[in-house]
Amino acid sequence: MKYELSQSISQRGIGEKDAENQRIAEIADELRRRSQVYEAKSGAGQEHVSHFDAEQRSAELYAKEKGMWIPMDEVFDLGLPGASGNENDIYTREDTVFKVNNLLNSGSIVNLLEKVILHNSIFPDTFYYFIGFAGYDRRSVMPVLQQDLVKDAQPATPIEIETYMAAIGFTKKNYEGRFANNMYEVWDLVPRNVLKDKDGDIYVVDAEIKRL
């Protein structure tokens, strides 16, 4: 495989997490810039290219330049397939979970990366690292994220989720699994996305987030 998986799995401290958030932001900025250039060049010709397609091709080229491209036939090398959701295919290796994201909820790579940064700020215990992009040449490109595995976990109950979110300063809204404070709105906090370990600690492993 062309990407450095062993390095991505190594232990990281708070300073390294700050650096990772900065790296993700820089990747998002670069993809935004490249997509605009790609669209402009395509617009000068006869073939119209959508923003989504421009972003996809820009991400593929960027990943191949940076050694972050994961061919789809190598995705199973990430780990053992696990229970997948609407947006993520899950692979587990030792203490690590890899998520191959199909962008169903976020709609674009840049949107997803920006959401990852927000998640990392609000829920640092389930910090996401960006590994690279998986896909077939000139077809769908999917970001690959890494998260620590929550061991011996079970789904948290709605009451446990509400109690946890209140403890970190969020108020429950009118809809189930939706919370907000004066900076962020977080939703889809349902039991499948929030886990409780054997010590009773709560972990938000997946959430939809927007800045207010």
Name each model feature, range by range.
Residues 102-104, 120-176:
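Conserved structural core of kinase catalytic domains
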Residues 76-81, 87, 131-136, 176-183, ...:
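Catalytic micro-motifs at enzyme active sites that drive phosphoryl/nucleotidyl and oxygen chemistry
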Residues 45-50, 73-125:
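ATP-binding glycine-rich loop module of kinase domains
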Residues 3-4, 11, 15, 41-43, ...:
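C-terminal effector/catalytic modules and regulatory tails appended to multi-domain proteins
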Residues 102, 178-212:
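Catalytic activation segment of kinase domains across protein kinase-like and atypical kinase folds
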Residues 1-76:
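Juxta-kinase regulatory segment immediately upstream of eukaryotic protein kinase catalytic domains
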Residues 87, 97-99, 144-146, 186, ...:
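Short hydrophobic-acidic sequence motifs that mark active-site Asp/Glu residues
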